[in-house]
Amino acid sequence: MGQSSLKLETIPLNDCHFSDAAPVGSVIPTESEVYDAVAQLWRQEPELERAGWEEWRARLKAIHPGWSLSVAHICRTLEKHCMSITGITQFTYHELVTSKESPALREPHLAKVQVTWSEKGKGLVARRPLAKGELVFAEDALSFIPPLEKSTLVHLSKACGSCGTSLSQNRYYYVMNNLDCDNCTTIWCTKGCRNLDTTHDFLKHPMSRNKRCSAQKWLKFEQFCKENTWHSAYSVGVMFARYYLHSDRRLQGNFESLAEVSQRVRLHAADTMNSGAAFDLGVDLTANAQSVCMWEEGYGLFCDAFPLAKDEYDLDFEKFLRYVGKFNLNQVNGQIYMLLSHLNHSCEPNIYYELEGHHINVYARKEIKSDEELTVSYVNPLHDVDLRRRELRVNWGFLCLCDRCKREISKKNIDKAGHSSTTAGPEPQSYRGHRRKSSLRASKPTLQDLLENGKEFDIEIPSQPGFAARRASVRFDSKVVTAVEERQ
């Protein structure tokens, strides 16, 4: 019987042999493939928004060398899907946004500010000079919306039925302090949270005989929203129940006075094949081609939960979509703050806010003069100008033309012109590796870069409640060493 031994052998990994790859230029991509490729590249590198058609074609060919792709093909595809590369014809909807005068703002909130109207709509200005760091105003949420994602934990008595906070005491503690429901498993963490949950009996107890609301069908609507990550419709339902079931005219008036636009319009701005969905800063994940069908089904469940609302409030499907769009336009961290919703945007804001639960504090970022407009940034001010403007266009319907945006656009155009004048000949092969990546990718290499170069880099592990954020390293190599048995 022969003896065997082990030897080390280096073998290729990650499909390094591409002999079976399609010949260059042999595949004509479909419109969907072109659109998806452009959308992905646009998300990764927003500065390409002002690139020419030939540059886009070169970038797409570099990523998909097997494609037979013409400029005309790219133009036709993007025009068909209402997507413009040049930025000249990008869809905006700010002129479709409407609002009304808020009927019941609390006087203490208006001590340092006052509401004004301009071509931009409602706004806030300072009544008197404000010092840097001064508290401008503070307010609670218009009507606190329980977190939809905590509904299962609430049902299991593991989280507060109002704010969703994890419950730390045993059940006996809550029973003794009258913080439990007599008819279901819901528990509240404090008496304040119990008092906030004014519609609990109507929405959570199937035995309720209220003609205006079917608790059993509300629970179906709630589950539907949870399954489809449709937080805005759920929030509209909670808000509507609060003023509808209690005839709360003040709450109704304040909610209906907020700026609104149909969610159908916002979906159009988000580009129906998902290029804009990645930028949607609302609370939903529903910006896709199947959204309308989901909306119709959800509206049907909403009407089942409130059988008289359609006639009593003329709440047809289009009005329901305007309510959903209203919530997405005005929400901050899943809540509505009345005075904060009056603030207009600036990429160089003069105020900022801090959240404490469902309470918000607004401070002066710098010294503010009397009668000066108060502005806040709707997006991350550290983002690149192209990314900021795209987020604003998709989520709030306008292309920002503030002084900062104009300066940065002008500088980019000058830099681009200077680069073009000093560049001769074809793009080098390392073009894609040396381009500045957008802030979305945080300058991390692509998967293809890793497989080709075997570089080591840090990847982020999502943080979990109660745990500090961690980092880990991962290495990709094109070859590995394996042990092979050799018989002698």
Curated annotation (Swiss-Prot):
Q: Does the keyword Endoplasmic reticulum apply?
A: no
Protein name, as recorded = Histone-lysine N-methyltransferase SET5
Localization of this protein: Nucleus; Chromosome; Cytoplasm
Protein source organism: Eremothecium gossypii (strain ATCC 10895 / CBS 109.51 / FGSC 9923 / NRRL Y-1056) (Yeast)
State the family it belongs to.
Answer: Belongs to the class V-like SAM-binding methyltransferase superfamily. Histone-lysine methyltransferase family. SET5 subfamily.
Coiled-coil boundaries: none
Q: Which UniProt keywords apply?
A: Chromosome, Cytoplasm, Methyltransferase, Nucleus, S-adenosyl-L-methionine, Transferase
Cross-referenced CDD domains: SET_SMYD
